[in-house]
Amino acid sequence: SLGQPFAGVYSTYLIPNNHPDFERRVEDLENAVRLVWSSIYTDSSKAYFNAIDSMIEEEKMAVIIQEVIGNEYNGKYYPNISGVAQSFNFYPFSYIKPEDGFAVIALGLGAYVVGGEKTHRFCPRYPKLQLASIQDMARDSQKHFYAIDMTYSEYNLVPDGEQATIKSYDLKTIEQDGNLQHCASIFDYMNDRIGFDFSVRGPRSVNFPDILQYDYIPLASSLDILLNIFSQAMGAPVEMEFAVNRENDEWIFYLLQIKPLIKNDYHMDIDNENIDFDKAILRADKGMGNGRL
């Protein structure tokens, strides 16, 4: 929608497509399409339509079928990295400008990212610039990830919903799959520092050091270029969802979705000379955000 964002309003179903009975696999796909289409009538969707003063009867929705990016590891299917990037950043810091954008990435399926869980945030133009301290990175790091459970084929999408085929796993599992290297570092409590020797015991901090600090793969520069191209093409700030997957020792970037970022601009002229600041409830010489309280 060009008028209002609808991301996350409707349902998304991921199916393993591995049942031995082909007819059952077709049935699962048909049920998933029906459930996505009917999700427009859920209480949460109706509440969103009421909030934006829109009518469900006027909605024209298409159901999209996409292949899930990833590989199978020991009965689990997931991509190495999932993320969301925006070309406008409402909360810049240091010398980062709002127009430099930002990205959030995590291990495993993108449901972890769009669900608002603990992700790693960075600016694609300045990926080495970090606001968090070493202790903050260890505390606020990703602790689990999502993958499609390929070992269970007798799921039921109707009663179990979007989580019918998705399971949460801890970081030890993804490390055993061989997919934590280049994506995490080890917090050394004794010396209060970050290390990269995975044979050392200690909490894993998912901060993608090799990728963002040492450009193991050009993820940050690729995002910076794409955000600039897409925002110019659309004539507005954009948001995109993406995945990065390692296939035969090659890292491949997948663009999953792109849409305009709805940003309302408010302009107000303020006469500072006639304002009694002694009576002001709140005053800030420097502020950031979307400009509204």
Residue ranges and their predicted role:
Residues S1-L293:
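Conserved mixed alpha/beta core segments that line enzyme active sites in large multi-domain catalysts
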